[in-house]
Amino acid sequence: MDMGFHENEQNQEFANLMEIGSGHYGCSHYRRRCKIRAPCCDEIFDCRHCHNEAKDSLHIEQHHRHELPRHEVSKVICSLCETEQDVQQNCSNCGVCMGKYFCSKCKFFDDDLSKKQYHCDECGICRTGGEENFFHCKRCRCCYSKIMEDKHQCVEGAMHHNCPVCFEYLFDSTRDITVLRCGHTMHLECTKDMGLHNRYTCPVCSKSICDMSNLWKKLDEEVAAYPMPKMYENKMVWILCNDCGSNTNVRFHLIAHKCSSCGSYNTRQTQRGSDSHSCSSGMPQVVGSTG
């Protein structure tokens, strides 16, 4: 009975330490009960993102800009008792849990378990969304949803570059990322912003980022409804299709040029036709970017 009582008491004490201050400390990036000492500049910050916003922004002189090396963090400060100590999940002084999720490899703390954090050894960092829902693509060198397994277009180091819209580095971004049909990646929010501005092609390779068949049908109707003047009706131009990569020779039209191979209007003119009267004959045209 006594042993059971003491065991229950210990369990209750552990539960209390897990909850004391939970959700009340941290920053705009993470809820956590500790701060970190940056190994690069020896200053104290709530998290690595807070450090990078302060030390790697445009208002800092370029030769002073730097990012925090997350794996080199060795000291943390408990937010409740302010004790500085080696990296560990529970405070060495007051015993409070400094993060319900703790990764000793990334020196990472987070009290919000709803993110379903997990550490990927192949990525070398912690990710969110639940390990059971993701797989690591060795060629793309990042974690993707299992829905995409054996279904995505591989691109070497797909997320090891900046977003082509906002230029934030994608690999360790905390914002949602989408994989386009061509295999290139960008922030989901940036993709939606492109849609608001009627931009439906990949900023990297110019391929269509969604099913454009309905728009192509409308363009078929538009082209049929507006025949070219007699001086242009026999004019032929060479076009390159951004979607399938084919070079085809098609009839010139002011509205759009349709790929003879795949039927896409996401094309651009690559060579002057036989008739030089048109001022637009040498201009590139990407109809897929209009909506």
UniProtKB/Swiss-Prot annotation:
GO terms for cellular component: endoplasmic reticulum; nucleus. Gene3D superfamilies: 2.20.28.10, Zinc/RING finger domain, C3HC4 (zinc finger) (3.30.40.10). It catalyses: S-ubiquitinyl-[E2 ubiquitin-conjugating enzyme]-L-cysteine + [acceptor protein]-L-lysine = [E2 ubiquitin-conjugating enzyme]-L-cysteine + N(6)-ubiquitinyl-[acceptor protein]-L-lysine. Changing residue 184 to Y: Abolishes E3 ubiquitin-protein ligase activity. Disruption phenotype: Decreased relative stomata aperture under normal growth conditions. No visible phenotype under normal growth conditions, but mutant plants display decreased sensitivity to abscisic acid (ABA) during seed germination. Expressed in roots, leaves, and anthers and stigma of open flowers. InterPro entries: RCHY1_zinc-ribbon, Znf_CHY, Znf_CHY_sf, Znf_CTCHY, Znf_CTCHY_sf, Znf_RING, Znf_RING/FYVE/PHD. A zinc finger (RING-type) spans 163-206. The modification Phosphothreonine is found at residue 178. Zn(2+) 2 binds at residues 40-41, 51, 66. Residues 271-291 are annotated as: Disordered. Pathway: Protein modification; protein ubiquitination. GO terms for biological process: protein ubiquitination; regulation of stomatal opening. Its main location: nucleus. A zinc finger (CHY-type) spans 20-96. The keyword Phosphoprotein applies. Zn(2+) 6 binds at residues 137, 140, 152, 154. Induction: Induced during sucrose starvation. Repressed by sucrose. Induced by cold, drought and salt stresses, and abscisic acid (ABA). Zn(2+) 4 binds at residues 103, 106, 119, 126. One of its GO terms (molecular function) is zinc ion binding. Zn(2+) 5 binds at residues 120, 123, 136, 143. Possesses E3 ubiquitin-protein ligase activity in vitro. Mediates mainly 'Lys-48'-linked polyubiquitination. Promotes abscisic acid (ABA)-induced stomatal closure, reactive oxygen species (ROS) production and drought tolerance. Involved in the regulation of stomatal aperture. Interacts with SRK2D/2SNRK2.2, SRK2I/SNRK2.3 and SRK2E/SNRK2.6. PANTHER family: E3 UBIQUITIN-PROTEIN LIGASE RZFP34 (PTHR21319:SF58), RING FINGER AND CHY ZINC FINGER DOMAIN-CONTAINING PROTEIN 1 (PTHR21319). This is E3 ubiquitin-protein ligase RZFP34. The gene is RZPF34.
